[in-house]
Amino acid sequence: MDLAFELELPVIIHCRDAAHEMIEICNDLSNKGKCPKGVLHCWTGTPKEMKQFLDLGFYISFSGIVTFPKAHEIHECAKTVPNDKYLIETDSPFLAPVPNRGKRNEPAFVENVANYMANLRSTELFTIANETSKNAEDLFKFDLLS
């Protein structure tokens, strides 16, 4: 994370069952003025944990898990994450979204994630596509939309 901060590059964090520890690490870096931008890949945390990462400037990325019927806390996160702080992903070849759950995940299945996010957020697929494209541009410093 020090190198990412030094090079002004974003970090991609896969944090599973260790949100408290990761928040502590990021808070320590932030207190030193050295916390890089980044994204919490394949989000599986709680709304409270999400808020803590958002407060540190991180983005939250939702995978096929958001389509799972029993993923209630992730659904709540997907509904409440700010428009300018989320991404979507597939995590291929793992965690295929409904209706492909249990199969090998494919990049094309990101559309299932986007549709599910649109339903959860009571918006259109077009809105999800635009918001996540803009957010990816902002985080990764490239130009998709022009």
Which residue ranges define each predicted feature?
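Mid-to-C-terminal alpha-helical segments outside catalytic/metal-binding sites
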Residues: L3, A108-S146
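Active-site micro-motifs of SAM-dependent methyltransferase domains
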Residues: I60, F94, D138
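Alpha-helix initiation/capping motif
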Residues: C15, C42, T67, P99-E106, ...
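Catalytic pocket-lining loop regions of alpha/beta-barrel enzymes
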Residues: M1-L87
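Short acidic/histidine-rich active-site segments
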Residues: D84-E106, I128
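Ser/Thr-centric signal marking residues that sit
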Residues: T67, T90, T132-S133
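Residues that scaffold the ATP/ADP-binding catalytic core of kinase and kinase-like folds
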Residues: I25, P97-V98, L139
